[in-house]
Structures are given as C-alpha cells and as structure tokens.
C-alpha cells in the first residue's frame, strides 16, 4: 500500500480500468509470475498508542511497530520503526518494548486483543489507505491453460477482491461497536501530524521512483491516476458523507 495513496475503490479503478494491472504484470514478468488483485481491507486504522499524539513533536522517539514505507516515513519524522511478527505485537506493546503499533483495523485488532495493551486507538490509517492483496500464479502454468480456464482464474480473483472488502466492511463496524462499548479512546490524528507525514511520504515515494525506469513508470501512472480520480472521490463519496455531519 502507498502512504496517503489511493483508497480501495480508487486502486481497483486504476488496476482494472487504468494501466495498473498491466504495469504490475510488467514488474513480475522477469520473475515468471502473473499477479492478480485478490483482496483489499479498505482504509486501515492508524494504530494503537500508549502515548497521545497531539503534535509532530510526539512522533519524535516514538517506538512503533510499522513496517514498509510507513516505517520509513515514521523514521524521517523522528520515530523508531519496528518490524515485528504478529505473534510478538501484543506482548511488545504491553511490556513497553514499543509505544505503538499498527495492525489492520477493528476486526483483526480485536482478535489480537490490542485494546487490552494500549490506551488510544488512532485513525486514519494514512500508511495503508487501500492495501491490495495479490494472487500470484506461475506464468508458464497460467499460459498453458485454455483461455476459458484463464478467465475462470481471473474472475475468481476479482470475486475474492470484491468479497474481501465487503467482508471487512461488515466485520469492522461490529468490532468498532465492541471497542466503543469497552470505552476505548478512539482519536483522530491532528491535521498538523497528518500534514507532516504526508509531506514526508511524498519525498519517500519520489526518491523510490527515481531508482529505475520501471519504478518511474509505476509512480507516474499511479500518481497521475490519483490526481485525476481524487476530485471525483471528494465530491462523490466524501461530498455525500460530509453533507449531513
């Protein structure tokens, strides 16, 4: 997933109706693999914290389990990112090895009991706004299939993609209700903090895009699509939701 990037619906639009999937296939070509989108959790949560985040100063020295690009962004903001296996998160958070952790969202976080190890539950998940899961297929095996059987695989992956985000929407709201009953302190990151993280994210992504030609192609395609699709998201989904707050 790309920090401050596309939502699940925007990502699917880019993959299926932009050139996202073609570029994905191009990236995997030399590995003799065929990728297919096969799931998405939707926007995740920002994480569980044992310290309040009131300003960018609170990010300095923050020990947080957050891998990948999000971890690089946190490091540049003054924090210390940790990469921990899921089985290590609860104990590390409870004992103070880390101050905070991101995992997924209410449904998965409840299963891990993270509300018993941290005081504050922050949103939004700026680091994973629309993480696309993949089904990876051996290219030779895929090419040896008939067109009909290839279509069956493609359609099954697309069905799994749609099913997962629908499933998460259903299970997340139920888990959120549970957290509210448990009096979990659900808080929004301050705009100052999100603005700083967004600025750093842009720097990180731009640096990555300059590493090689293929990275530049993916970056340019992704960012151009995001630039064009976001205005519609803001006046459609966001416009509707904000119209009766």
Whereabouts are the PLM-identified features?
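N-terminal secretory/targeting leader peptides
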Residues: 1-11, 23-245
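Core domains of carbohydrate- and sulfate-ester-processing enzymes
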Residues: 15-23
């Amino acid at each position: 997933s790309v920090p401050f990037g596309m939502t699940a619906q925007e990502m699917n639009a880019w993959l299926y109706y932009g050139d996202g999937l073609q570029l994905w296939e191009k990236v995997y070509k030399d590995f003799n693999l065929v990728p297919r989108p096969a799931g998405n959790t939707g926007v995740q949560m920002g994480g569980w914290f044992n310290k309040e985040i009131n300003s960018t100063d609170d990010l300095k020295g923050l020990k947080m389990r957050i891998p990948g690009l999000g971890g690089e962004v946190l490091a540049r903001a003054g924090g210390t990112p940790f990469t921990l296996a899921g089985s290590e998160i609860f104990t590390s958070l409870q004992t103070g090895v880390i101050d905070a952790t991101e995992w997924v969202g209410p449904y998965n976080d409840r299963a891990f009991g993270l509300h018993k190890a941290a005081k504050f539950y922050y949103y939004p998940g700026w680091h994973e706004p629309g993480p696309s899961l993949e089904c990876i297929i051996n290219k030779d095996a895929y090419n040896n299939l008939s067109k009909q059987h290839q279509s069956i695989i493609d359609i099954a992956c697309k069905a799994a993609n749609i099913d997962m985000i629908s499933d998460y929407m259903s299970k997340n709201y139920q888990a959120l209700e549970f957290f509210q009953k448990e009096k979990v302190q659900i808080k929004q990151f301050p705009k100052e903090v999100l603005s700083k993280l967004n600025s750093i994210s842009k720097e990180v992504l731009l640096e990555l895009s300059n590493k090689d030609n293929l990275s530049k192609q993916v970056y340019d395609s992704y960012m151009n699509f995001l630039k064009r699709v976001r205005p519609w998201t803001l006046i459609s989904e966001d416009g509707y939701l904000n119209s009766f707050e």
